[in-house]
Amino acid sequence: MINEIINKLKEFAQQNFPVPEVSSYLLDLNLNENELKFYSFHEENFYTRNLIHKDSDFELMVICWPPNTTAPIHGHEGEKCWARVQEGQLEICNYEEISSEPL
C-alpha cells in the first residue's frame, strides 16, 4: 500500500499537486495501520517525523505526536502541504503572515 501511495503522489507531482484531487485522495485513502507501524516511532515528550519517502517533488512521512505536544510556529515557504490524522486528534492553527521582516 505504501508503494501505491508513493506512486499516486508521483502522478500528482506531474500535475503540480492539484489541491482538490490530492485532498480527496488522502481523505478517501484506506490506510493499513500495520503498514504504518513500520514507520511510526514515538517519543514521550516531543513529536517525531518519520520519513517514508523523499524525492525532488515531495516528502511523505508519518508524524507521531504525543498528547498535548506543540510545534513552534513555522511556515512551509510556499510549498503545498497536507496532513491526515490516522489515529487521535490534531489541532492546527494557521496564521496570516503580515511581514517577512525579522521581529
Regions inferred by a protein language model and the residue ranges of each:
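N-terminal leader/capping segments at the start of a protein or of a new domain
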Residues: 1-34
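A short glycine-rich, His/Asp/Glu-containing loop-to-beta-strand
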Residues: 38-67
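A short beta-loop-beta micro-motif enriched in histidine and acidic residues
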Residues: 54-58, 69-82
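Short, intrinsically disordered, charge-balanced linker/junction segments flanking boundaries
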Residues: 100-103
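Glycine- and acidic-residue-biased ligand/ion/polar-headgroup-sensing regions
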Residues: 67, 78-96
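Context-gated lysine
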Residues: 8-10, 37, 54, 80
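Phosphate-binding glycine-rich loops and adjacent basic patches that engage nucleotide phosphates
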Residues: 23, 44-49, 79, 84
